[in-house]
Amino acid sequence: MLMKADQSTLLLIDVQERLMPAISEGDAVAERCITLATIAGLLGVPAIATEQIPEKLGPNLEGVKELCNKTLAKTHFDACPDGLIDELPEGRQHIVIGGCETHVCMLQTALSLLDAGYKVWVVADATGSRSELDRDVALDRLHQSGARIVTTEMVAFEWMVHSKHPHFRDIQALIK
């Protein structure tokens, strides 16, 4: 099944100032999250971010804050009990997820979204945990649970559909 931009929402989980330095390959994960949010903006895909206890872990990184349409503060690891589903745009059943930590907040949120009937794509190169083992096991579990595991480039090209898209060159420059 292909992702469709007009049916998608980008969800960036906890790309926070005090959390990212602890994440394995945290700079690369943050860069990919910002790239995804930029692409979403160019293509009219709504972008929502979450922040886990922002008073302790700080706000999301500046690029994420600027590019997302909404930010949901939360205390649960799973963003759904804190109101995420109410914030998702109606009629968009494809949820594309990046962020941290893969094995905690992202995993629990993705599983709840699957349970709620959403189609979930997890962007592997835009997710991270402190431990690569935790990240890898979480991605495995998500795949076994019905989430589709993709990369930032896969998202970009599936959302654009063809090389004649008006933003093709802009997006190509972001991902190359």
Model-derived features with residue positions:
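A short alpha/beta connector and helix-capping loop motif
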Residues: 5-8, 24-54
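Short acidic, Gly/Ser-rich segments with clustered Asp/Glu that frequently serve as metal-coordination loops
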Residues: 17-21
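N-terminal nucleotide-binding beta1-loop-alpha1 segment
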Residues: 9-15
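Short, solvent-exposed loop/turn segments at secondary-structure boundaries
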Residues: 22-26, 132-134
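A cross-domain feature marking catalytic cores of carbohydrate-active enzymes
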Residues: 15, 49-52, 124
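Active-site-adjacent betaalpha module
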Residues: 2-9, 42-43, 55-176
